Amino acid sequence: MVILGIDPGTAICGYGLIEVQGNRLSALAYGAVRTPAHTSQASRLQTIFTDLEAIIATYRPTHVAVEELFFNRNVTTALTVGQARGVILLAAARAGLSVHEYKPSQVKQAVVGYGRAEKQQVQQMVRVLLALEEIPKPDDVADALAVAICCAHSLTWGVACR
């Protein structure tokens, strides 16, 4: 099973692909879709959509896991991230993929064992669980891998991400 985890964003959209073989998780590929600040929102969304379609075509994941929108005080940021989530969900739907959505607290619970874990704790566990030499950067990439790990725990071992 191959899971594509995504941490939505318009400037940086992190992605991480993991493979699940029995009890073993391994990172296949990870990175970030970056969009220039000076471009229109429509252009940024098109870049995210096009790049994710290419990633899906290349790695052929069986599932897509997306972090749910965490509403913050900046409504404008929440709206633009919501738009990014929309094109991400569209890319997954066009490929006929099963989409799983998780709250940040669910991801932290699945990866660290504590739903209010610090970002550094999550990043360190991503490195350990996937046997990576270094913590993936930028943070959005480690977050995307964490979402994929949460999905793997949920689908493979029936662990409810609470």
Curated annotation (Swiss-Prot):
Coiled coil: none annotated. The active site is at D7, E67, D140. It is found in: Cytoplasm. Binds 2 Mg(2+) ion per subunit. PROSITE patterns: RUVC. Mg(2+) 2 binds at E67. Disulfide bonds: none annotated. One of its GO terms (cellular component) is Holliday junction resolvase complex. Signal peptide: none annotated. Mg(2+) 1 binds at D7, D140. Keywords: Cytoplasm, DNA damage, DNA recombination, DNA repair, DNA-binding, Endonuclease, Hydrolase, Magnesium, Metal-binding, Nuclease. It catalyses: Endonucleolytic cleavage at a junction such as a reciprocal single-stranded crossover between two homologous DNA duplexes (Holliday junction). Its main location: cytoplasm. Its cofactor is Mg(2+). The keyword Amino-acid biosynthesis does not apply. Its EC number is 3.1.21.10. One of its GO terms (biological process) is DNA repair. GO terms for molecular function: crossover junction DNA endonuclease activity; DNA binding; magnesium ion binding. NCBIfam families: PRK00039.2-1, ruvC. PANTHER family: CROSSOVER JUNCTION ENDODEOXYRIBONUCLEASE RUVC. Belongs to the RuvC family. Homodimer which binds Holliday junction (HJ) DNA. The HJ becomes 2-fold symmetrical on binding to RuvC with unstacked arms; it has a different conformation from HJ DNA in complex with RuvA. In the full resolvosome a probable DNA-RuvA(4)-RuvB(12)-RuvC(2) complex forms which resolves the HJ. The RuvA-RuvB-RuvC complex processes Holliday junction (HJ) DNA during genetic recombination and DNA repair. Endonuclease that resolves HJ intermediates. Cleaves cruciform DNA by making single-stranded nicks across the HJ at symmetrical positions within the homologous arms, yielding a 5'-phosphate and a 3'-hydroxyl group; requires a central core of homology in the junction. The consensus cleavage sequence is 5'-(A/T)TT(C/G)-3'. Cleavage occurs on the 3'-side of the TT dinucleotide at the point of strand exchange. This is Crossover junction endodeoxyribonuclease RuvC. It comes from Heliobacterium modesticaldum (strain ATCC 51547 / Ice1).
